[in-house]
Amino acid sequence: QTQNAHLEFVEVLNVKEQVVAGMMYYITLVATDDGYKKIYKTKIWVKEWENFKEVQEFKQIVYATK
């Protein structure tokens, strides 16, 4: 079974940026999974000049209600 296969984006709660070899974005967001709202944290590394984007981390941090 594929994890996170049924996620649907709801909203962004928070974004932080860090300058690295490019930019690292730390995003907290809400998504629904089979109708249940859950909160996730993701870390995305971006190097614009190389057209490079990579998800470094994506994990659920809070269970929410329907």
From Swiss-Prot:
UniProt xrefs under InterPro entries: Cystatin (IPR027214), Cystatin_dom (IPR000010), Cystatin_sf (IPR046350), Prot_inh_cystat_CS (IPR018073)
Cystine pairings recorded for this chain: none
Matching CDD domains: CY
Annotated motif Secondary area of contact, positions: 18-22
Keyword Isomerase recorded: no
Source species, domain of life: Eukaryota
Gene3D superfamilies: 3.10.450.10
Pfam families, per database record: Cystatin (PF00031)
Induction entry: By abscisic acid (ABA), jasmonic acid (JA) and wounding.
Protein's UniProt keywords contain Cell cycle: no
GO molecular function, one term: cysteine-type endopeptidase inhibitor activity
UniProtKB keywords: Protease inhibitor, Stress response, Thiol protease inhibitor
Expression by tissue: In tubers of untreated plants. After ABA treatment or mechanical wounding is mostly accumulated in leaves, to a lesser extent in stems, but not in roots.
PANTHER family, per the entry: CYSTATIN FAMILY MEMBER, MULTICYSTATIN
Similarity field: Belongs to the cystatin family. Phytocystatin subfamily.
Name this protein carries in UniProt: Cysteine proteinase inhibitor
